């Protein structure tokens, strides 16, 4: 289970970072500046979450002003199904890890017939 959440997690975060960087470039930032802004945002956010005992949803609400830019962006992310896509992707990774594990068990039985005893 951890593989689906943590083992493959860095790729999820990096994809999200890519999307943010690309959006920054679309807004007019150089790729270098957009990359640095996203890196600093990620670093600061992780530190903020690490230092707080509060749930991430509470922290998100604390940095979201009603009717503000963050609220607007989050509305569009939710409307676009971000949570559903992430949840389905992690479930698919979990299912894939089970399938790969089953394949490994079958290969081990072929290599070591005593494993069936």
Language-model features: locations:
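Anionic-ligand binding region
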Residues: 1-36
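NAD(P)-dependent Rossmann-like dehydrogenase/reductase catalytic/cofactor-binding core
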Residues: 35, 39-117
């Amino acid at each position: 289970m951890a593989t689906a959440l943590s083992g493959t997690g860095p790729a999820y975060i990096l994809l999200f970072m890519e999307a943010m960087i690309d959006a920054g470039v679309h807004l007019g930032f150089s790729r270098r500046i957009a990359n640095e802004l996203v890196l600093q945002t990620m670093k600061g956010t992780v530190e903020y979450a690490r230092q707080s005992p509060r749930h991430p949803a509470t922290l998100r609400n604390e940095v979201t002003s009603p009717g503000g830019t963050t609220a607007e962006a989050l509305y569009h992310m939710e409307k676009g199904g971000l949570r559903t896509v992430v949840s389905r992707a992690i479930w698919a990774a979990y299912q894939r890890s089970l399938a790969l594990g089953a394949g490994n068990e079958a290969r081990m039985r072929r290599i070591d017939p005593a494993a069936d005893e």
